[in-house]
């Protein structure tokens, strides 16, 4: 008969949330720049929009927006209001909603500080999620350099927020 005591229970494994806006923004930026430098402008442009979306959502989360179970922007507006959460959108509507519904951001002062580092964020006014379906000749190719500049500003903003300990 063995007198060994039972093994201690294993500590629960902590699984990080699936949604990681900052990491996604950086991944999309790396891929967008690779595509841009090889002349694949249509897909680079699409990814620059995703950089903007993910970077801005990372900032909003850092400024107090409560995450859903996956770690992302929740699907519903905070109580007592009802309906879809205004920050659960793509650019350019996301940028419009940040301005129009600014009161839902718990730390608006901090959000303003970092948004000021992205003066060209409204250059995504003609970016559409639906561009992914369009013919190359129908895309606003002339806007891609503007989107690139704004996406670079967003990654620089993320760098600053990270350096400041906000992200």
What do these predicted regions represent?
Residues 1-167:
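Terminal alpha-helical segments
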């Amino acid at each position: 008969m063995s007198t060994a005591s039972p093994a201690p229970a294993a500590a629960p494994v902590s699984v990080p949330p699936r949604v990681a806006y900052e990491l996604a923004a950086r991944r999309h930026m790396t891929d967008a720049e690779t595509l841009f430098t090889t002349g694949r402008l249509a897909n680079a442009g699409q990814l620059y929009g995703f950089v903007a979306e993910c970077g801005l959502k990372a900032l909003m989360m850092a400024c107090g927006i409560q995450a859903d179970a996956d770690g992302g922007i929740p699907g519903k507006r905070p109580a007592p209001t009802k309906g879809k959460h205004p920050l659960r959108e793509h650019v350019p509507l996301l940028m419009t909603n940040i301005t129009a519904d600014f009161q839902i951001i718990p730390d608006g002062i901090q959000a303003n500080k970092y948004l000021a580092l992205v003066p060209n964020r409204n250059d995504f006014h003609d970016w559409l999620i639906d561009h992914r379906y369009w013919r190359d000749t129908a895309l606003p190719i002339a806007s891609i350099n503007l989107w690139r500049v704004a996406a670079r500003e967003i990654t620089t903003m993320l760098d600053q927020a990270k350096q400041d300990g906000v992200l």
